[in-house]
């Protein structure tokens, strides 16, 4: 299981590299979609089925809208690719090589570990007398509204501000 999450983390970083080294806006949106999808798989790998599904539906649904919008606004007859400029391709390959080197070093020194989340016991197990029941659907809702409240507020306001930034940029 750790190797699965480790490979997904590496793919997430490669997607972020693709986002940072985008030669055209089309590939930036594609990098965000790939990174978001891999992030959802990581959440599912840790057992957060509801939260992974919510992120997949809401975040990637919104990203597909933004991806379609940027594609429509920045359509080029011959868009640049990662291979059309040797400098961009070199940085992308260098980033992937550095990521593989980091994976090898971490595996050699056995530094890969799972994060210990101590405060999760309050809402994971529902105990009555000596019997404990875990409700899977409610775990995601509890996580979203108890531990991740400020992240949701910041994400909502960021999306709200992003709409106005996009409107201001595309205004004639």
UniProtKB/Swiss-Prot annotation:
Record-level Gene Ontology MF annotations: NADH dehydrogenase (ubiquinone) activity
Compartments (UniProt record): Mitochondrion inner membrane
Biological processes per GO annotation: aerobic respiration; mitochondrial electron transport, NADH to ubiquinone; mitochondrial respiratory chain complex I assembly; proton motive force-driven mitochondrial ATP synthesis; response to cocaine; response to hydrogen peroxide; response to nicotine
Cystine connections: none
InterPro entries: ComplexI_Subunit6, NADH_UbQ/plastoQ_OxRdtase_su6, Nuo/plastoQ_OxRdtase_6_NuoJ
Enzyme Commission number(s) from the entry: 7.1.1.2
PANTHER family named in the record: NADH UBIQUINONE OXIDOREDUCTASE SUBUNIT ND6, NADH-UBIQUINONE OXIDOREDUCTASE CHAIN 6
Role of this protein: Core subunit of the mitochondrial membrane respiratory chain NADH dehydrogenase (Complex I) which catalyzes electron transfer from NADH through the respiratory chain, using ubiquinone as an electron acceptor. Essential for the catalytic activity and assembly of complex I.
Subunit note: Core subunit of respiratory chain NADH dehydrogenase (Complex I) which is composed of 45 different subunits.
Protein name: NADH-ubiquinone oxidoreductase chain 6
Organism: Mus musculus
Gene: Mtnd6
């Amino acid at each position: 299981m750790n190797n699965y999450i480790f490979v997904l983390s590496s793919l997430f970083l490669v997607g972020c590299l693709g986002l940072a080294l985008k030669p055209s806006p089309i590939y930036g949106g594609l990098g965000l979609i790939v990174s978001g999808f891999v992030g959802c798989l990581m959440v599912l790998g840790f057992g957060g089925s509801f939260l992974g599904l919510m992120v997949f539906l809401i975040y990637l649904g919104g990203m597909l809208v933004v991806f379609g919008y940027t594609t429509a606004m920045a359509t080029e007859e011959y868009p640049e690719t990662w291979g059309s400029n040797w400098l961009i391709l070199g940085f992308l390959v260098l980033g992937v090589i550095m990521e593989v080197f980091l994976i090898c070093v971490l595996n050699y020194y056995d530094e890969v570990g799972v994060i210990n989340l101590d405060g999760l016991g309050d809402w994971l197990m529902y105990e009555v007398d000596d019997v404990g029941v875990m409700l899977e659907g409610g775990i995601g809702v509890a996580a979203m509204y108890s531990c991740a409240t400020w992240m949701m507020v910041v994400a909502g306001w960021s999306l709200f501000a992003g709409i106005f930034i996009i409107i201001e940029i595309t205004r004639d």
